[in-house]
């Protein structure tokens, strides 16, 4: 599968939830652009884009199971979901492992290993900062609240 096919599959997975579809398109667009401007190699760029597309894959399940999309729950549920989602995508095991790692850590702002993780987290932290009141930015938690 190419990026467009993974995007199409993720949109279908979203079951018409316009918020989820809009969010994944925004995150993917920013991740794609930043990755290209940073000059990522092809494999890292592709991994970043797939992680950006699938990073909130657990949101529908979390809404149903827990009544919210708490970041910790997304991380717990997201890894196995994205592995299953990508099973027929024709990616290497290493690439699926990396995407699953990124999806299951996208609310964790410590121990960032790799530019793909740094870009994905950077996009999320920017969004989180918008939610905080002026003067409160220094109080960013180690894990984000629900998204």
Regions found by a protein language model. Name each.
Residues 45-67, 78, 100-107:
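His-Asp-centered metal-binding catalytic motifs of divalent-metal-dependent phosphohydrolases/nucleases
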Residues 4, 28-29, 79-81, 97:
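A generic alpha-helix surface/boundary motif
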Residues 27, 72-88:
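An active-site-proximal "capping" alpha-helix that borders the catalytic cofactor pocket
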Residues 2-26, 58-69:
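Active-site flanking loop/helix segments enriched in acidic
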Residues 12-25, 29-41, 54, 91, ...:
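Divalent metal-dependent phosphate-bond-processing catalytic cores, especially two-metal-ion Mg2+/Mn2+ enzymes
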